[in-house]
């Protein structure tokens, strides 16, 4: 069972997964006005469409594009090691990447997570603002 589904089950409440997919540096420094070409998109996964719509609106208000990423069963794509985790993609690029993900990508999630954790731990004292998105894009096989 995916962690997000487990959390929803434990809480007995709707869960919306969104803000785990952006680093604190990007959240703090990269909000942009609607329509800006540099605007970062956040994938938003939830089984409750109304709750998802509320969070997409909130994301827009703080300067990012919220993109419907399906239900919680699809939320693995935005977990550490997934192609949508902290990659700072535009809405159009995020949708493109999301559509191209397969069961093979899901199968590699654990391995990519372990590699990412190791790299972040090794860089913990020297990680600078743009490093995490570049590292995550590299692990996902996305161009920088």
Task: For the regions a language model picked out, list residue spans one by one.
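Short beta-strand and adjoining strand-loop segment in the mid-core
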Residues: 1, 5, 9, 29-50
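Residue-level marker of positions within ordered structural domains that often coincide
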Residues: 12, 21, 60
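General beta-strand structural signal in soluble alpha/beta enzymes
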Residues: 14-20, 67-69
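Rossmann-like dinucleotide/flavin-binding elements
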Residues: 23-27
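Active-site-lining helix/loop region of Rossmann-like oxidoreductase modules
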Residues: 37-144
């Amino acid at each position: 069972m995916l962690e997000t589904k487990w959390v929803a089950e434990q809480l007995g409440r709707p869960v919306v997964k969104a803000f785990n997919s952006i680093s604190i540096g990007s959240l703090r420094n990269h909000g942009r006005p609607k329509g800006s070409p540099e605007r970062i998109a956040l994938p938003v996964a939830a089984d409750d469409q109304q709750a998802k719509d509320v969070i997409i609106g909130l994301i827009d208000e703080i300067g990012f594009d919220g993109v419907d990423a399906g239900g919680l069963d699809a939320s693995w794509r935005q977990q550490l090691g997934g192609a949508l985790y902290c990659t700072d993609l535009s809405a159009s690029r995020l949708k493109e990447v999301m559509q191209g993900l397969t069961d093979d990508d899901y199968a590699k999630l654990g391995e990519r997570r372990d590699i990412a954790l190791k790299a972040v731990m090794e860089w913990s004292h020297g990680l600078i603002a743009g490093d995490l998105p570049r590292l995550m894009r590299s692990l996902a096989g996305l161009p920088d």
